[in-house]
Amino acid sequence: ASRGLGDVYKRQHLIRENERAGKLDLLCASIPDPEAAAQAQGLQHTKMLYVAKPRGVRRYYPMVFLERCFGVAAPYDPWYQKVQLSLALELPTPDLIVAEGGTLTQCSAISKMFGKRRCLAHLHGQTSCSHEMDAIYGGILALSEFIRDDYLKTSELDRKHAYILHNCIDTARFVPGPADAALRASLGFAPEDFVVLFCGRLEPDKGIHKLLEAMENIHDPRIKLLIVGSPFFGRTQQSPFLRKLEQQAETLGDRVRFTGYVPNDSMPEYYRLADLVCVPTLVEEAAGLVAVEAMGCGRPVLATRSGGMPEYLDGSQAVLVDRDGNVAGQLSFAIRMLYEHPDLRAQMSTAGVKTAQRYSSARFYDDFVRIVYDFGGHLWNSPSSV
């Protein structure tokens, strides 16, 4: 079952690679999506199971907010009830069920119907386990060692069933190339400018305000900042935090540019026009795909030492700074240092491109299939339906 935008991104990679290799029969349960339905026409190894939201479901989501923030138990989501019935009719005995996103405890009835040993939870971020989670899932897929180890601190799950499935990018799109001079000029950057790029949601956890503080400590007018993103995915609405960022940036004048939301399909061009990509996350980052995409495009990366970030950047020669009381000071020092050492940036670029190749969609698919065989080996001689 899949309900999140990030889930869809990974699901597309999985479906595309499975159409090429044909090692699995996939049944994807999701809310109705006309665009996805059109794209699914002609698939040989994947079937889409669209389950509409039942009436009254809007009253459920405020309860989910209370559960996540204050521990107040939410009732059973009626959407999952419909998924359970649809699965029973469509595929009476699935070999394996992978829960993607949403509230993972909502799969309890599905687990009881098909068996805990057929159920895997795909953890996209830090997740605290509970007795209920342990009762529902016989295994997990974690985006990084950090996410896996953090989950196991509160779980009784056997470590051998806690799998690592690193995220992936489209390595055919995120590749090195020349900067788009017209795009760079349209954003107000001169050829001699040193452009630092931030890409992500504009919220405090992402640390963009600390990067702006770092820019305030840098007085070279040629060092500039490009901020790509918005407070909400795919939207351009204002937020109180964005207004604060814009006020903070006023002191820097034309050294800061805001683009608003940019679709992922256009991001390679933005990465390539930058001289340095900064990921100043202040919380535990599950994976850090922005950094991987930037490396794929040959851009050196400066990031905070958070969550799974060091794991994903291992071998890339990326510069990592600690999340202490002087994040802005560390960032400004690192930016100036990299600005003054183009030879070091070139080495980081070469190493980063090589590192990014580890996160291809083909590798993601092969790892997924390997996990399916390992986790479900006791249920079948060879995997078929997931």
What are these regions (language model features)?
Residues F114, S239-Y261:
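Nucleotide-activated donor-binding/catalytic signature segment of Leloir-type glycosyltransferases, i.e.
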Residues A1-Y9:
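Single conserved hydrophobic/aromatic residue that forms the stacking wall/gate
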Residues P300-A303, L320:
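Short hydrophobic beta-strand element within catalytic cores of glycosyltransferases
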Residues A190-K206, L212-M215, L225-V228:
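Conserved donor-binding/catalytic core segment of Leloir-type glycosyltransferases
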Residues F146, C168:
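Carbohydrate-associated surface elements
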